[in-house]
Amino acid sequence: MGKTADNHGPVRSETAREGRENQVYSPVTGARLVAGCICLTPDKKQVLMITSSAHKKRWIVPKGGVEKDEPNYETTAQRETWEEAGCIGKIVANLGTVEDMRPPKDWNKDIKQFENSRKDSEVAKHPPRTEFHFYELEIENLLDKFPECHKRHRKLYSYTEAKQNLIDAKRPELLEALNRSAIIKDDK
């Protein structure tokens, strides 16, 4: 992924990358590697959220799978933010890694039987489903035409509203990333 003609940010494609055949997984845990952005307004009072492609009434943040040809997580985060939200901006902070510890969709539902069969009380119930690498991005521009503009809605929310959206969407790992950002916490 090169630079735009003005050398500012990644090249912005007109189509979104889809499918998981070129995505990267952790060699240690098998978790899918994902990168995304917490996109804040310059005054840090609002965060940009998008509707989930799987659950249209749930609001989340832009993120997606790391591809084999991407040199780093930051590149993936900016690409996904462009494709899913039409957001252009500057990365201002690395928010670190957050693991999605929700059980995989096909995980054994009878976890009690597994727990009872083990004497080790500290055993992990399952490995992380996803390993997220998040960045804080300062919004410079929101373009109307972007690869997923016909699939998703986007909206700016205050911290309190965004926090509730992520609780409603059952996405504690995304809330963790939001909490690590410099957004003004208006719920205090």
Curated annotation (Swiss-Prot):
Q: Which cofactor does it need?
A: Mg(2+); Mn(2+); Zn(2+)
GO MF annotation list: bis(5'-adenosyl)-hexaphosphatase activity; bis(5'-adenosyl)-pentaphosphatase activity; diphosphoinositol-polyphosphate diphosphatase activity; endopolyphosphatase activity; metal ion binding; phosphodiesterase decapping endonuclease activity
Give UniProt keywords alphabetically: Cytoplasm, Hydrolase, Magnesium, Metal-binding, Nucleus
List, alphabetically, the PROSITE patterns matched: NUDIX (PS51462)
- For the ligand (P(1),P(5)-bis(5'-adenosyl) pentaphosphate), the binding residues are R32, S52, S53, K63, D100, R152, R171, E173
Q: For Mg(2+) 1, which residues are the binding ones?
A: K63, E84
Protein name per Swiss-Prot or TrEMBL: Diphosphoinositol polyphosphate phosphohydrolase DDP1
